[in-house]
Structure formats: structure tokens, C-alpha cells
């Protein structure tokens, strides 16, 4: 089970949002590279970066911070990045810079042709982030519910060659109320590609519960507010996940 620390970038700093609201942000670190080093030293095997300004602007906005993180990581573990990725040129620049996986969210739903082109050009490097509430896909920084069923959308993306799906229950994200494990497992069972859980991770109990259903197709979990607030010790959680897998 991959435990993936999240580094959300806003104005060059590491922050956490509550339910995707840019006005409800808590700054957890001035220097994102130092934050990246912390998780690397704690045993992280992948990092999850989000360009929050980019997500709202529709184009990259935190390039300096992203490059500083990549320099710190220096290729030792994969780094996945989402937020503001709307064209093939941006994907190419990020991959050339050292990003292992690009995460396409809103653009995948609003512009399916772009996602197909991305999978064709950068196969193996494309992850789709599907945000949902009550089983319906949300877009545009969670501000709009589309009415589209998350299972049917994910299945279509799987057929196009997406590497994996990050599934976020937006009713729980940043709330420390616990991962929606039933919904995550239901999605994973309907797909052949792996699912990464996200949204609401509260503590060790969630890690243990996810490990029990790992074989259903759940590759990992995004660790956000809980590892910054102290509700979850990242190194201890990764050790526990490894122990349960042994």
C-alpha cells in the first residue's frame, strides 16, 4: 500500500484546504522543498503535488516551487502532479522536468479528446483525478457537479489507457472524517486499473482498513491534512501498512 504525502501549493507555499475552498487554507510550510525532504526522510515512496493556483487558473502557476521539490527529490521516488494541466505542451514540460505522473482532473471530463491524446502521447504517465460527491463527478475545483456517474466515467477513461484513478470523496476532503472506503472499493472493483484513495484520511484506523481491501484494486492513499495536523504519524503509518502486507 502506497502512502502518498500530499504537498498542495498555493502562492509558492505548502497549504491545506478544507473541501477545496481556496479561502479556507492553512499554511503548513514556507519552503515546499523542505516539506518534500521531510516526507522523503520519513520513508515516502511517492509524492503527490497539487498546483492549487494552477487548478483555478487553468495553467501552471507554481513552477518555481515544483522545480525546487523535484531538485530535492532528485529522482529517488516518483512524483505525481495535478492542477492546471490542460494541454499536451504542459504535460511534456512537466515530464521533461522530472514529473513521473501527471494528474488530469477537470480537463479529462470537459475535454475527453485531450485525455485521449495525452494517453496516446504519454502512455504510462497519465493519472486521472476523479472528484465525486454522492457518486456524481465534480469539476472546476469542485464547484460544479456534472451529474455523470463516477463509475461509467472511470470505465471510459480506463479503456483509453489511463494508468490509474485517484478517487476523492469531496464531501470528506480536508475534514478528517475518514476515507469513504465503501465507495472507493466499489469503484476499484469495477475497474482493472488501480485506484488511489483520497479525501478525509483521519488516522491509523483508515490505513488499517484500506490495507484490508488493498487486494480489491486499491494501490494507495493520498495523505493530506492528517499528516500535517499530527493526527497521523506518516512513518508509523507506512510501517504499519508494510507490516499488514507482510
Swiss-Prot record:
Q: Which Pfam families match?
A: His_biosynth (PF00977)
Q: Which family does it belong to?
A: Belongs to the HisA/HisF family.
Q: Does the keyword Isomerase apply?
A: yes
Q: Which UniProt keywords apply?
A: Amino-acid biosynthesis, Cytoplasm, Histidine biosynthesis, Isomerase
Asked if the record carries the keyword Cytoplasm, the reply is yes
Q: What is its main location?
A: cytoplasm
Tell me which GO cellular component terms the UniProt record holds.
Answer: cytoplasm
List all membrane-crossing ranges: none
- Organism (species): Delftia acidovorans (strain DSM 14801 / SPH-1)
What is annotated as the active site?
8 (proton acceptor), 131 (proton donor)
Q: Which GO terms describe its molecular function?
A: 1-(5-phosphoribosyl)-5-[(5-phosphoribosylamino)methylideneamino]imidazole-4-carboxamide isomerase activity
The EC number(s) this enzyme carries:
5.3.1.16
Which pathway or pathways does this protein act in?
Amino-acid biosynthesis; L-histidine biosynthesis; L-histidine from 5-phospho-alpha-D-ribose 1-diphosphate: step 4/9
Its taxonomic placement starts with:
Bacteria, Pseudomonadati, Pseudomonadota, Betaproteobacteria, Burkholderiales
- InterPro entries xrefs: Aldolase_TIM (IPR013785), His_biosynth (IPR006062), HisA_bact_arch (IPR006063), Isoase_HisA-like (IPR044524), Isoase_HisA-like_bact (IPR023016), RibuloseP-bd_barrel (IPR011060)
Q: Which locations, inside or outside the cell, does it occupy?
A: Cytoplasm
* Domain of life according to the entry: Bacteria
Q: Which GO terms describe its biological process?
A: L-histidine biosynthetic process; L-tryptophan biosynthetic process
Record's catalysed reaction(s): 1-(5-phospho-beta-D-ribosyl)-5-[(5-phospho-beta-D-ribosylamino)methylideneamino]imidazole-4-carboxamide = 5-[(5-phospho-1-deoxy-D-ribulos-1-ylimino)methylamino]-1-(5-phospho-beta-D-ribosyl)imidazole-4-carboxamide
Q: What is this protein called?
A: 1-(5-phosphoribosyl)-5-[(5-phosphoribosylamino)methylideneamino] imidazole-4-carboxamide isomerase
Amino acid at each position: 500500500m502506497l502512502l502518498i504525502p500530499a504537498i498542495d501549493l498555493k502562492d509558492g507555499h505548502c497549504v491545506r484546504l478544507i473541501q477545496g475552498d481556496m479561502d479556507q487554507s492553512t499554511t503548513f510550510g514556507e519552503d515546499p522543498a523542505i516539506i518534500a525532504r521531510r516526507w522523503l526522510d520519513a520513508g515516502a515512496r511517492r509524492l503527490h503535488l497539487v498546483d492549487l493556483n494552477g487548478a483555478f487558473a487553468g495553467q501552471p502557476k507554481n513552477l518555481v516551487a515544483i522545480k525546487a521539490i523535484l531538485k530535492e527529490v532528485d529522482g529517488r521516488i516518483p512524483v505525481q502532479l495535478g492542477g492546471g494541466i490542460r494541454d499536451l505542451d504542459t504535460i511534456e514540460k512537466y515530464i521533461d522536468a522530472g514529473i513521473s505522473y501527471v494528474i488530469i482532473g477537470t480537463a479529462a471530463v470537459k475535454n475527453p479528446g485531450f485525455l485521449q491524446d495525452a494517453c496516446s502521447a504519454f502512455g504510462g504517465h497519465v493519472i486521472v483525478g476523479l472528484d465525486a460527491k454522492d457518486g456524481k463527478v465534480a469539476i472546476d475545483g469542485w464547484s460544479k457537479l456534472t451529474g455523470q456517474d463516477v463509475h461509467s466515467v472511470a470505465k471510459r477513461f480506463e479503456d483509453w489507457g489511463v494508468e490509474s484513478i485517484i478517487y476523492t470523496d469531496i464531501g470528506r476532503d480536508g475534514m478528517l472524517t475518514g476515507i469513504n472506503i465503501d465507495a472507493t472499493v466499489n469503484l476499484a472493483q469495477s475497474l482493472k486499473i488501480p485506484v488511489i484513495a483520497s479525501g478525509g484520511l483521519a488516522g491509523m484506523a483508515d490505513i488499517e482498513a484500506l490495507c484490508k481491501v488493498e487486494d480489491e484494486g486499491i494501490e494507495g492513499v493520498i495523505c493530506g491534512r492528517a499528516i500535517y495536523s499530527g493526527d497521523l504519524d506518516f512513518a508509523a503509518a507506512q510501517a504499519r501498512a508494510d507490516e499488514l502486507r507482510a
